[in-house]
A protein has these predicted regions:
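Globin-like tetrapyrrole-binding proteins
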Residues: 1-140
Length: 140
């Protein structure tokens, strides 16, 4: 199996066990990055949490499937967060919180193929985010 197959399988498993990882992602994210909590203080900001997690999953899948617009998704992601002064450390904390929440929800280990695939793909996404941040007005 390759990364796309492992990642799609993990998403199917999450659906089968009917676990919403969003609260777990943000619990871990805020623990690792408490300075981000005030950015989600409004009801509107809290409402987008699920959207952000879903967009992350979709972006990874789209990149793996070679969708032509996937590079634009990363540009949009960084641009959308520019005004919030989101730094690379916040992206790092969010990506780690996501994969850790998936790992725990699926009761996997760090060495399971699904988690290795997620970490590899999120690492590549992080590189693209960092490159995009370098050209934006947000602090790195």
């Amino acid at each position: 199996m390759n990364d796309i197959e492992y990642i799609l399988r993990s998403l199917e498993q999450l659906a089968e066990v009917d676990i919403d990882v969003v609260p777990c992602v943000y619990e871990r994210f805020f623990a690792a990055c408490p300075e981000a909590r005030p950015l989600f203080a409004t009801r509107e900001a809290q409402a987008v949490q699920g959207k952000m997690v879903n967009e992350l999953m979709q972006t990874v899948v789209d990149r793996l499937e070679g969708k032509p617009y996937s590079a634009v998704m990363v540009q949009t992601m960084v641009s959308d967060h520019d005004g919030w002064r989101v730094r690379i450390a916040m992206y790092d904390a969010f990506l780690d919180a996501f994969v850790t929440a998936v790992r725990d929800a699926l009761q996997c280990t760090e060495t399971s193929p699904e988690i290795i695939a997620w970490r590899r793909q999120l690492s590549m996404l992080r590189q693209d985010i960092a490159a995009q941040l370098a050209t934006s007005t947000a602090p790195v």
